Design a protein with these regions (language model features):
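Membrane-interface helix-loop-helix junctions at boundaries between adjacent transmembrane segments
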Residues: 71-75, 80-144
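N-terminal signal-anchor module of multipass membrane proteins
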Residues: 1-54, 298-300
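Structural signature of hydrophobic alpha-helical transmembrane segments
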Residues: 39-51, 89-98, 170-182, 220-232
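Alpha-helical transmembrane segments in multi-pass membrane proteins
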Residues: 22-30, 45-57, 74-79, 83, ...
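Cytosolic-side transmembrane-helix boundaries in multi-pass membrane proteins
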Residues: 1-19, 265-301
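Long hydrophobic alpha-helical segments that form multi-pass transmembrane helix bundles
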Residues: 114-188
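C-terminal ends of transmembrane helices
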Residues: 4-7, 55-67, 103-114, 187-197, ...
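Loop-to-transmembrane alpha-helix initiation sites
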Residues: 117, 121, 224-232, 251-254, ...
Length: 301
């Protein structure tokens, strides 16, 4: 598992470093967009988050006599995704706490990459959401809008109001939100890059988005606004795909189940957004889904 993201009996030349490097490249458009939309503080948060994750992993591994694996880019990806899940107004020290919790507690305590049960970046976000919720509730408006802060599309619709932004605004990213989640267009560019490189499970993402679209339409919600708001695009393209799945059926079930939970939380939950919670919940079920749908390898004589 040190070099490979897949089950050992599935032969693939793709290494962890190669895949994670491409994920970093795929996240560049959204990172550039966050700086354009929210200013250079967005860049500062991203750089600090990556630096803390990489340094935290290296120091932990050195202190415990383990091989230092920061060259596989997985810690850098975690740092970028944590920054993408916070607002430009979030204090730097809060982001640092999320980074350290994600890298040390969620990732290293469980044995490092490939051994952690849940997504470290999302657990880092959940940690600061539980400990310092007020620090994550303020969302800045894009710089070309003459308002300092405002409600997100999901918050406005949750309270029974109008979205307040056009669908085009939501697609392009000219809406309040976390750094890396507002522009569906820029995220899509990165996702297509990974799909062309065959380094993302498109089946999971397709099942996830289709489920959200169908269910929200069935319940009388605007499915297009639902797809373009909150962390749905970021989560569906970069955090829902699970590189450890070997069966197509398992991947589809994973995507569908995550989509169902997202819609349930958005409709009946206390919070307007449910992507983070849904992904983490289904992360915990991924082993069961894999075992139910994969061929068992018992060895040879």
């Amino acid at each position: 598992m040190a070099n490979q993201l897949y089950n050992p009996y599935l032969r693939s030349p793709k290494t962890t470093a190669g895949v994670m490097k491409d994920v970093c490249i795929a996240l560049v458009p959204a990172a550039v967009g966050s700086v354009i939309f929210f200013g250079f503080r967005a860049l500062l948060l991203i750089l600090v988050s990556v630096a803390v994750c990489v340094a935290g992993e290296a120091i932990w591994q050195k202190a415990h006599g383990q091989p230092v694996t920061v060259a596989d880019f997985s810690a850098a990806v975690t740092g970028i995704l944590i920054a993408f899940n916070v607002s430009s107004t979030t204090p730097i020290w809060v982001v640092v706490l999320a980074d350290l919790f994600a890298i040390i507690v969620v990732k290293q305590f469980f044995g490092g990459l490939g051994s952690n049960v849940v997504n470290p970046a999302l657990m880092g976000r959940l940690f600061i959401m539980l400990v310092y919720p007020a620090k994550l509730m303020s969302y800045a408006m894009p710089m070309d809008v003459d308002v300092v802060s405002g409600a997100t599309i999901l918050s406005a619709m949750k309270q029974g109001g109008e979205a307040g932004f056009t669908l085009l605004d939501a697609f392009l990213g000219k809406v309040p939100g976390a750094l890396g989640e507002t522009s569906v267009l820029l995220l899509l560019i990165g996702f297509i890059y990974l799909a062309v490189k065959k380094e993302v499970n498109v089946t999971i993402s397709a099942a996830f988005f289709a489920t959200v679209f169908i269910l929200t339409a069935a319940f009388g919600m605007n499915p297009f606004y639902q797809l373009c708001s909150g962390g749905l695009a970021l989560g569906g393209m970069f955090m829902v795909p699970d590189y450890n799945f070997s069966s197509r059926t398992g991947r589809m079930l994973y995507g569908v189940l995550t989509g169902v939970i997202v819609v349930a939380i958005r409709m009946w939950g206390s919070f307007p957004e449910g992507v983070c919670y849904a992904i983490l919940m289904v992360n915990c079920m991924s082993g069961l889904l894999e075992n139910l749908n994969s061929k068992h390898v018992y060895g040879i004589k």
